[in-house]
Amino acid sequence: MNSHIHTAAQKLAQGEVIALPTETVYGLAADASNSAAVAQIFALKNRPTNHPLITHISADADIGYWIDASRMSDEIWRLTNALMAAFFPGPLTLVLPKHPRIDASVTGGQDTIALRSPNQAVFQDVLSELARIKNTLNVGIAAPSANKFGRVSPTHAEHVRAEFGDAVWVLDGDASVIGIESTIVDLTSGVPRILRFGHVTPNDIERVTGIVPILPERMGSDVPRVSGSLLAHYAPTTPMVWSSAENINETSRVALYHSDDFALQDYEQAIRLPNNAIGYARGLYHALRTLDGYAAEQIVVETLPNDEAWYAVRDRLNRAVVGSHLSSHLGQNKLNKSEK
């Protein structure tokens, strides 16, 4: 066994918070059964304690340990089994009724739990080693993205180190191959409700379940709180604005674009991402961190296609645009106060 795997699992078993790679983004990880360790996650991230975490489990885990079967109808079981067969392990998180034994600190005080099994060998190996050390199969790792709350998620080990320095031990598992957070689907009503867009699309969910999922804009307020659902999120410190492709050449010194029919030849601080949603998502957060490092007045982002394949990327960038302006405003207020 890789000694780093054992070290990671040992640190988790001892109640430490570490950073682990997944196929989506790097996570700030703690033993989900250790409420003190989970509290450290919230403190390190400056994350509100009512903002629930995703619990990551092994590919062959018994979900019966984590969920309240008495609140699972036959239809909820059917949906759960179908989606797990298709996407566990993978970039899908399921929201289900929480078993009373699960500490409320992981779930933000809610009676639901968010479960995912990462499709990442290093993470799965850490889960297996943690189970061996603790001598139980019922292990879970709580792991939100390894960044300060509301900021750009990390997809490389160096992103985490830049965020937390020596305060967090990082297990380097190379770059995240998907690059954005998992799709979150709430099954507690017996109908799939997408709470966060991700790599798994609404069409994917319909194909597997036979049901057209309810999209976020069609829901009321009676849905569980979940990671990444705030209006302002995933944000750099530099203000971001949308722009059409034809206007980017005229307005931009720092830009993020994808069109194939032009190039920003004279703009060293422009990044072109692939002109497809999967490739764009894979490079998005690394590109935002790079552009943010230029400390420009603004980052101009080329508008994206409106089809389903781009839902998740558009969602992240829409929230980043809002969050970047809030971040810039707060930063200016701090500067003004320091000058008084």
Regions found by a protein language model. Name each.
Residues 1-340:
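Active-site-adjacent structural elements in enzyme catalytic cores
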